[in-house]
Amino acid sequence: MENIMNNPVIGVVMCRNRLKGHATQTLQEKYLNAIIHAGGLPIALPHALAEPSLLEQLLPKLDGIYLPGSPSNVQPHLYGENGDEPDADPGRDLLSMAIINAALERRIPIFAICRGLQELVVATGGSLHRKLCEQPELLEHREDPELPVEQQYAPSHEVQVEEGGLLSALLPECSNFWVNSLHGQGAKVVSPRLRVEARSPDGLVEAVSVINHPFALGVQWHPEWNSSEYALSRILFEGFITACQHHIAEKQRL
């Protein structure tokens, strides 16, 4: 039987909620299970680890960084806009921005989903559409909350993969495919540090990667949903874990 303690250690940024009046940090099972099924060992990262001295001690122990989706949104002041964000999670923002920049500097693999993609965009100098529904040229990218969860995560629209990038290398036989869509915000301006990897039919950025980094991929859809049942989703997670294994090998050579 495989010893899971030999698997790449993946740090997963948590989300803050309130449970029975208590501040609580949580992770949804679907994100954790997708990492386990792909051969990784997920480790929860509470927001207090944003403290620089703690983060400096933590990063050498991690083989990959995983930024999951969340009901919360990135605070607008982080990308140069005014106004409040009612669905904010400042602790997550603080940890995510710090850990993205540190991971990029150390060339640690990153896989970012939904809010995670938006964090990757903001951390590298880009900005977001705060309300996609107010952009008349864009499709409806939100889910219908009245539907059962299985239907909310059903395929919603196609994405077109850009040639020559990380996503096309992972999916060489698949230049377009259908994805689910459960987000109210999205990438507005993408930094020159990022490569656009895929777009939806309305032109909205659906995937990005960091240029000159071995594996730093963000996707706007949710491949973690029943990831073991869908070949395309499995390939993304397995590609991430493979990159983490390569990072381990690089660390051992130093």
Swiss-Prot record:
Question: What Enzyme Commission number(s) does the record list for this chain?
Answer: 3.5.1.94
Chemical reaction(s) catalysed: 4-(gamma-L-glutamylamino)butanoate + H2O = 4-aminobutanoate + L-glutamate
**Subunit comment:** Homodimer.
A Pfam family matched in the record = Peptidase_C26
> Mind telling me what this protein is named?
Gamma-glutamyl-gamma-aminobutyrate hydrolase PuuD
Q: Name one GO molecular function term.
A: gamma-glutamyl-gamma-aminobutyrate hydrolase activity
Q: How does activity depend on pH?
A: Optimum pH is between 8.5 and 9.
Q: Which organism is it from?
A: Escherichia coli (strain K12)
Task: Name the keywords, alphabetized.
Answer: Hydrolase
PROSITE patterns named in the record: GATASE_TYPE_1 (PS51273)
**Protein family:** Belongs to the peptidase C26 family.
Which pathway does it take part in? Amine and polyamine degradation; putrescine degradation; 4-aminobutanoate from putrescine: step 4/4
Q: What factors induce this protein?
A: Induced by putrescine and nutrient starvation. Repressed by PuuR and low aeration condition. Repressed at the exponential phase and highly induced in early stationary phase.
Protein task: Involved in the breakdown of putrescine via hydrolysis of the gamma-glutamyl linkage of gamma-glutamyl-gamma-aminobutyrate.
Q: Any idea which residues are catalytic in this one?
A: 114, 222, 224
